[in-house]
From Swiss-Prot:
Species for this entry: Ixodes ricinus (Common tick)
Paired cysteines (S-S): 41-60, 45-62, 56-73
Signal peptide range: 1-19
Protein name per UniProt: Evasin P1080
GO cellular component, one term: extracellular region
Amino acid sequence: FFQLAVFVVILFNINLLSASAGSKGSSAPQSSGDSVVAEFCDTNCTMKKDGKWTECNGDCFCVHVGNETVGRCMRLDGDYDYTSSKTTRRNKKTRNGLCRLDRNRTTVDYPERNTREP
């Protein structure tokens, strides 16, 4: 009887863990005190031969992916100032990669994707 009880408890835990790990449905809405809206500007930015990036106009900053030499200018509007001189670098995880926010540019690094079908 003891072995059967342990087996049932193990099966219950496995079922509970697999159900919670596999749930990709919508969750309850979460509220954040910091609201940010990202908008692309009308201009692009490019990496110069010296490795520096061309400046974007106004409140816009340069965003590029990985080692690309061409990027887009982007603006963040909201309650939180990502381009503040007080914070020269912040890391923020995005859904598909790591987004590094600097004063002058933002880099999005995407991890290698698994191309095999599940």
